Amino acid sequence: MILQDALRLNIHGAKAAYSLGNFWYANRQYDNAIACWEHSAAINPAYPTVWRNLSLAYYNKRDDKQKALETLEKAYALDEHDSRILMELDQLYKRLGRPHSERLAFLEAHLPEVEQRDDLSIERITLYNQSGRYAEAKELIAARNFHPWEGGEGKITGQYVLCRVELAKIALSEKRYADALVLLDETDAYPFNLGEGKLANAEENDIWYYKGEAFRGLGNEQQAIDCFTKATIGSSEPQQAFFYNDQQPDKIFYQGLAWRALVERIRHAAALTN
């Protein structure tokens, strides 16, 4: 093989060792790949991509999380303008259970790179939502034009809905029923900047339930009943969601809340007629 010959003729050829490692990894010769990359990194430790490749191999093929972390952090330290390595490092932090506050602080220390990528921008928004900072997440979503990618379907629309539902729940707890309804109505259709439309079969038991609560708070009993009825629709069998458009298991919980609300109204109506 040409790369093997090149390395044999020049044992200090860092690029040849790196490229040979790429060949071995692509052909599932993982130990050979790691050996080549380690050799390349020893010769030229200033090349970030070889450290990044070693990190992926350590994590995925040797289950060595500590070495994966050390090498990926080294790769990013060598080139902090590489937004892809930043994304991969944040994903590694996520897998290793790094606290939300630390991940968010890390991303916000590198905002120019975060803003280069939709996936990083969505992670930042997700961290805001997970930290209970829903209004800030809502503002960030409105300020960016997103582009769908394979494997990323439903990510930004999910965060768009989540922050509005959570803000609506806060409004309901404060008896601001009209404000809650405005927020929930914003989930009826998605704005163009999300880059994705709403699926025809979207399961929205939670949204319909909270709309029912808002209408009940406003004294509109019939519309509340209509919303609670819509919130009962869907499968009541718990099942794992494999795809983003599958029914999420928590929707069954809101079906139950909606049925309880309807039963309470039936009992109330029966009590009034007796």
Language-model regions, residue ranges each:
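Conserved structural position within tetratricopeptide repeats
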Residues: D5-R8, E38-A42, E73-A77, A109-P112, ...
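Single-residue signature of alpha-solenoid repeat helices
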Residues: A33, A68, E102-R103, A137, ...
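Residue-level detector of the short coil/turn that links helix A to helix B
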Residues: R28, R62-D63, G97-R98, G132, ...
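Residue-level recognition of tetratricopeptide repeat
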Residues: N22, L56-A57, Q91, T126, ...
